[in-house]
Amino acid sequence: MSLRFEFIQVAMGLRERLSAVPSVHEWQVLFEFCKRQSLLGVGFAAVEKLHEVGVECPADIRLKWYGYALKIERMNEKLNMQCGEITKRYEHDGLRCCILKGQGNLLNYPESLRMRRTPGDIDLWCITPPSGLSMPNATLRDYTNYHGINAVIEYVRMQYRLQGIDANPKACYHHIDAPSMDGTKVEVHYRPAFLRSPLRNWRMQRWFEHHADECMKNKTHLGFSMMTSSVNVVYHMCHLYTHIFEGGVGLRQLMDYYFALRVWHNDVMECKDLQSQGMWSEGLGTPVMSAQEVMAVIRSFGMGKFVGAVMFVINEVFGGANENEKGQRRTWRKTDGGPQADFVGKRESSEFKQILNGGPQADDGGERKLKRINRELKENNFAPWMICEPNEKEGRRLLDEIMKGGNFGQYDTRDAALKKGGMMKHGIWKLKRVMRLVRSYPEEALWEPVFRFYHLLWRMIHR
């Protein structure tokens, strides 16, 4: 196992120590790795834990690391307060709100890591009441009643006018930038996620509309709402899938999903206990979705293969076989993420017998076939909180993208001149990236250019 992955597992409490003591150079590599993946705060927890068992990080690296960790803790305190403030203000004005990603994810982390998660901006999912919102127009003299997405967009633009900011923010298909709060970027979402395929996207929007009410009511002790655990597991998979086509994802997003899965699985177990007592669960009487139900929803969005890839990466990086992973574990045998095979095919069985009996295939070629058969028969554990079997083939591709690109693909040097060029060059870069994904996710990739044109028209209408 990679020393970098072991280091992250130590930070998460999944492993007590590393398999080898890092050299000074390796400590620098670990620091840069955590920096690229936006895991510096979490990584410093590993530095502290290793110090307790006598493994010392060089003083200069440790001091620099500590500075980053302290800054991250203060940023989390600030954003927690701001999330409560903006939720209170928006709800007072008639909107219903729910924090997405970011500070909502923070509550899924264990107490020891909660304030060490690297924060980003504030993402707020807002919906309007059925009666709409009555707001002053641009002249601030007459009032107009707005409904649905238009109401959210106009409300955000009104915030700029009320604060005296001369700006006309451009609305995207799923969100619009609101005025920042003391330097913190705020994105107001009227759609929590989206897909390029029209049919899949229609299904997704309908599903989130159906579950919006339970999320808006799911209040936390920090003064804002967050998604229920079942909806969160689906939403985060949609979020990861979207960013794969945008620029990439990093291990910070995969760690968010790991802890979201753990919280969801705990709720599933608690739900079973409560149902056996004739009670309901998930806060508001909403039943917690089972793994089969979660996968049915995700497959209806066309993301079945991608889920298997994510499960492989999580199993490889966070949830692999380590000394502290608890609970009964299921098994998977095939490397392509397909259905579990409980027997070897007739041809492989015949080859296997010939090799064992010293038959004509018991040569170098036979040895290779024997190794292949053993590899196919080998049982690999995966944790009970996973929602499907890992897909090794797609998972290795995804992990390679993550390691090359870092957080949201910011460190990806492939076609850098195109990526950082003008609008035309950036469009070519994006098309090349999408075409790399055609083999793995053909439906979404082939709809991407069409959606891009549709999005241009949509923005012209809503500017």
Listing of model-derived features with the role each one plays in the protein:
Residues 1-120, 126-132, 136-270, 278-329, ...:
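Conserved NTP-donor binding/palm subdomain of two-metal-ion nucleotidyltransferases/polymerases, i.e.
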Residues 279, 339-340, 360-361:
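Intrinsically disordered, low-complexity proline-rich tandem-repeat tracts
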Residues 339, 348-351:
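N-terminal leader/targeting signatures
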